[in-house]
Amino acid sequence: MRLGVLDVGSNTVHLLVVDAHRGGHPTPMSSTKATLRLAEATDSSGKITKRGADKLISTIDEFAKIAISSGCAELMAFATSAVRDAENSEDVLSRVRKETGVELQALRGEDESRLTFLAVRRWYGWSAGRILNLDIGGGSLEVSSGVDEEPEIALSLPLGAGRLTREWLPDDPPGRRRVAMLRDWLDAELAEPSVTVLEAGSPDLAVATSKTFRSLARLTGAAPSMAGPRVKRTLTANGLRQLIAFISRMTAVDRAELEGVSADRAPQIVAGALVAEASMRALSIEAVEICPWALREGLILRKLDSEADGTALIESSSVHTSVRAVGGQPADRNAANRSRGSKP
């Protein structure tokens, strides 16, 4: 089965096309991205602006046509914190549905955490024992822990890299005092959640997912993406501390020149590093292993499982749409190929 997964994040919209079947390894066929910075397209009342919504709708419409031309049987479309937290999220979702035919759903933070954990568990298998997973997005930090495929603990905290950059580190480069203040604030914010997580049990394996963690690992010496997903990559607490001291003195333009840091992520990588550092400190983790699978893969796996046993894809909700029901004619296949990024 060929599936399309449309991920509307705080910074980017990402379409992943995969060939997948139950019991098999989902095979990525193409990846298409657009940088919208949706989290920044909000007004003083917390609403996504008309311009931001218009850009989102245009991008989703384009990507839905790419999914059709790629031969996808279904398109699973979901949004994370930028849409979820917006005051007018329902209005935006309604516009997307009416103008594109795509049923975009704002995932609950807990579902985001659970689906990511499912992907991590499937990647490492049962022999990994208790897994603790950290995932830093633009708007939130997800923390999950468990010994099964369903985590015992699944938290979503408003500690995303983009959110904290806007709220705490407006200067470029950020001032030392602001960095120190954010460190102290993060320690306080993570004190109670970390107790909840550790009470469930100490992890046998600490894992991290998300582009933020992959970039941080690369900056501290992990293998580049071209080495493939099965190469072991780790991020240590000591390496992270040294990295923060280095990148916090750089401008966003200079950080964007570093290998592993894209131009759209460069402004928020310092805040992301501080969240990673504080999370590892609060949970007494000295190193995390970087998992190449995350939320998108978790959604694909849950989709395949739900078709086999007849359960709901996500409790009380659905995030899939028949691509054939999407309005508009299939896009020109060559145009779709030209707009695709490199394979993950």
UniProtKB/Swiss-Prot annotation:
Pfam families: Ppx-GppA. The keyword Lipid metabolism does not apply. Exopolyphosphatase activity is inhibited by (p)ppGpp alarmones produced during the bacterial stringent response. The keyword Manganese applies. Keywords: Hydrolase, Manganese. Can also use, to a lesser extent, Mg(2+) and Zn(2+). Its cofactor is Mn(2+). GO terms for molecular function: exopolyphosphatase activity; pyrophosphatase activity. Signal peptide: none annotated. Its EC number is 3.6.1.11. Belongs to the GppA/Ppx family. Homodimer. This is Exopolyphosphatase 1. It comes from Mycobacterium tuberculosis (strain ATCC 25618 / H37Rv).
